Amino acid sequence: MSHFYERKTYRYPSYALAALAVLMAVSLFYFQWMLGLVGLLGVGFLLYYVIWSQRSLHKELQQYISNLSYRVKKVSEEALMQMPIGILLLDEEDKIEWSNRFLAACFKEQTLIGRSLAELSEPLAAFVKKGKTDEEIIELNGKQLKVIVHRHERLLYFFDVTEHMELRRRYEIERLVLAIIFLDNYDEITQGMDDQAKSQMNSLVTSVLNRWANDYGIFLKRTSSDRFIAVLNEHILTQLEKSKFSILDEVREQTAKHQAQITLSIGIGAGVSSLPELGTLAQSSLDLALGRGGDQVAIKQGNGKVKFYGGKTNPMEKRTRVRARVISHALRELIAESDKVLIMGHKYPDMDALGAAIGILKVVQSNQKEGFLVVDAMKTDAGAQRLLEEMKKQADLWARCIKPEQALELITEDTLLIVVDTHRPSLVIEERLLYRADHIVVIDHHRRGEEFIEAPILVYMEPYASSTSELVTELLEYQPKRVKLSMLEATALLAGIVVDTKSFTLRTGSRTFDAASYLRAQGADTVLVQKLLRESVANYVKRAKLIERAAIDEHGIAIAKGDENEVHDQVLIAQTADTLLTLSGVVASFVISKRGDGTVGISARSLGDVNVQVIMERLGGGGHLTNAAAQLSDVTVGEAEQQLREAIHDYFEGGKPV
């Protein structure tokens, strides 16, 4: 303050006024000395008063600033020690040099000085030393503390966010969740019942669902004979997930006692606040659950993540063919509106994919449109390769086969693209065709997965069907003009059915035999089917070696794996899994081996007690309840086996690891 006061620039105005006043007083002496004397005395008095006033003001201001500085310092010290923010200073060895009282109270200590961070909290020490961020929530003695670290200054701030985190937790667990419950086969089960039996079945299902809703605190409202709306929250949803949605089993078991097994599909929307968006998510989840065959729960979050529960039973075969007739008519109209049709299956097509594609090509030709099969002859399994060799003998049919590069050149905005035996964009032969095509049709028999082709104009997915070839055969039957198949075309479709049903032993319904009967009547050669499916001696020996390495645990889970340096094709891996399933005591089989494309392939089979589709989905794959597969990249066979065992353990949730 004194330096400020003594600065000359500060005193210049006073000097100037004093000099001016003295000059005026001296001037008066020239005219009249008495007036000059009085003026000089007056100027002296005023000058004295001004200097005295300035010095007094300076002292008062200095005292005020001194008092203010003391109070600010005192408040700062009190704030550092008393405010509800923890402050901590570290030395170069990560020992505490200083901390305020709030932080000491958090650790329930009198003083923290001299202690190391590791003594107080290992997570805190790890965060300060190796943390990738400058802030983190850490729990200390029951409190949630937000820690902000300034590493260069070795300074840490601690904010108590316990109440905030509790409010956030309550908000999250009380957030609204919407569910749509659908009775999968209610209409089919009750259509043959009299009024009394139908009323009893209706009352049974309603009472089971109402009891379940009351137990969990769910609001349940029936909106139609086969549909309910349920309102719950995230906390209740967590409880339902822990129970693995036992209501699915309860409804199935209770109705089975009345010789009419009804199954549920539940679509749940969660993770958003908007009610219209919740409703959209719930309906989308229900469509997903139904597309996977029903008898399961699909939970879709706002971020797009989907979880599945249930799916313990095979989809029930639909007794009505109305849908097949409607789809056949719609497909005919789409073909008629297109300039040409491209037909594409999945990568490394098997007999079902290739047979279904040949069947669709026949549908296209029967509607007088140009059609092409998109296939890479060098990338097919052994059976499909033999079928392609047979196709080469028929010039007209072989001329319809084109490579993916040719398809990219042929496609126009009016071209219809039909995808068979898959619905996943990542699995099609040429993914770029999906982005070039404006009109896409999907025909598949696999349970619908989270990944799906975007915006198809027609979807025909029936998980109850044995194969895509079965679905295509029915579409052929309902074409308005009677279609006459050649021997090879009928044989290709029949071979697709035989492969996917394991010679009519798995997933075979009455409509499967109807389709096979139709194809046989069209001239399908069963001997040629066997020739197409023949296995080489070398493959037989490889399969036997894989089976020899199989280990079967006490739960009936069989796992076989190849050596790290052995490469087997996917067909051989699948055949080995099929063979393992025929062994006594085996309820599910898994075969792991390196593939030719560098990935590790896993084929899974079951008799129905274990849902291998769900297990494979945990590894990024998919399929059916009894037949599924997955491909893992950048892993060894041993690492793939470990991931598989973890997925099996997660599936059983609490069961002993296999």
From Swiss-Prot:
Residues 340-497 are annotated as: DHH. Its EC number is 3.1.4.59. Its main location: membrane. Pfam families: DHH, DHHA1, GGDEF_GdpP, PAS_GdpP. Binds 1 heme b per subunit. It catalyses: 3',3'-c-di-AMP + H2O = 5'-O-phosphonoadenylyl-(3'->5')-adenosine + H(+). Residues 174-302 form the GGDEF domain. Keywords: Cell membrane, Heme, Hydrolase, Iron, Manganese, Membrane, Metal-binding, Transmembrane, Transmembrane helix. Residues 590-646 are annotated as: DHHA1. GO terms for cellular component: plasma membrane. It is a multi-pass membrane protein. Mn(2+) 1 binds at residues 346, 350, 421. InterPro entries: DDH_dom (IPR001667), DHH_sf (IPR038763), DHHA1_dom (IPR003156), GdpP-like_PAS (IPR049553), GdpP/PdeA (IPR014528), GGDEF_dom (IPR000160), Oligoribo/pAp-PDE_c-di-AMP_PDE (IPR051319). GO terms for molecular function: cyclic-di-AMP phosphodiesterase activity; hydrolase activity; metal ion binding; nucleic acid binding. Mn(2+) 2 binds at residues 352, 421, 445, 500. It is found in: Cell membrane. Binds heme b via the PAS-like domain. Belongs to the GdpP/PdeA phosphodiesterase family. Has phosphodiesterase (PDE) activity against cyclic-di-AMP (c-di-AMP) and to a much lesser extent against cyclic-di-GMP (c-di-GMP) in the DHH/DHHA1 domains. Also has ATPase activity, probably via the GGDEF domain. May monitor cellular heme or NO levels. This is Cyclic-di-AMP phosphodiesterase GdpP.
